[in-house]
């Protein structure tokens, strides 16, 4: 059978078309990979910053041998955990024991889907973005409870129960604060919430319109991250390491990663909800209204927005790290009393007050 040149060219064109379709099908993965790379770098930076700040507070030198200024210390620790033996408890529930850390990590990573890191730079601009974050973040304590229960260790089980109780206690005030912000912005979308703060620059931030909600959100976020003075689920003096007691190797490393990912997510949401997100702080001055000429300027706008967002997020990171090394740990009864008897009524009153002002202004 003889094939003429026209048929050969037709076959080649079809093969090129199929190749282009495959390439186009893989393009959607690039933003996700870029986000994962950025998250990895941010976690390494946060670990290094915490060690440097804690060393400064305690008047120590801090990490200095692994790379210049100790920048590679976090990578060295991660490599060590990756190469360590993964020990399983002989009488534990092995399936639950293995899946617990994965549930905690995945639930935190999914929260990044709705965070607008910069101008037009968000993976999923959903109309229920902040509620999706609250729903997803409530899954992480289930993984911690599974880890504590499946370890067949009383310290681990108590740590898991504490994690669940702490999450429930502070999730409700956190939700009320988010609802108040949504009422002010008339939207549950994270992008719309940032846009609603863009008109007056620094003076348009929700921080000034919701000062009580900001303080409650700040305290609740620290409790959700299980940072001092709220690290009751893993109190060394009482529970050895809490739900992490029986873990080793990469699984222990995943729990270590969860704490810093949670801190990063909380910092970014403080920025998005209260500090104007990617918007420039000076009133009536915006980088994004001056240049609308080509794609290069659009990329520059996005990079500037990401830089502004991360700069604001690092402010919360600095506050949380400083609090960790300056305040003592609370007792469990004090922690629950703070959540149920103090923060919950204040956040509910703040929500009712915001609702009243919104109804009056209609």
From Swiss-Prot:
GO cellular component: chloroplast thylakoid membrane
One GO BP annotation of this record: photosynthesis, light reaction
Enzyme Commission number: 7.1.1.-
Membrane topology: Multi-pass membrane protein
Cellular compartment(s): Plastid, Chloroplast thylakoid membrane
GO molecular function: NADH dehydrogenase activity; oxidoreductase activity, acting on NAD(P)H, quinone or similar compound as acceptor; quinone binding
Oligomeric and partner information: NDH is composed of at least 16 different subunits, 5 of which are encoded in the nucleus.
Family statement: Belongs to the complex I subunit 1 family.
Job of this protein: NDH shuttles electrons from NAD(P)H:plastoquinone, via FMN and iron-sulfur (Fe-S) centers, to quinones in the photosynthetic chain and possibly in a chloroplast respiratory chain. The immediate electron acceptor for the enzyme in this species is believed to be plastoquinone. Couples the redox reaction to proton translocation, and thus conserves the redox energy in a proton gradient.
Designated name of the protein: NAD(P)H-quinone oxidoreductase subunit 1, chloroplastic
Annotated source species: Saccharum officinarum
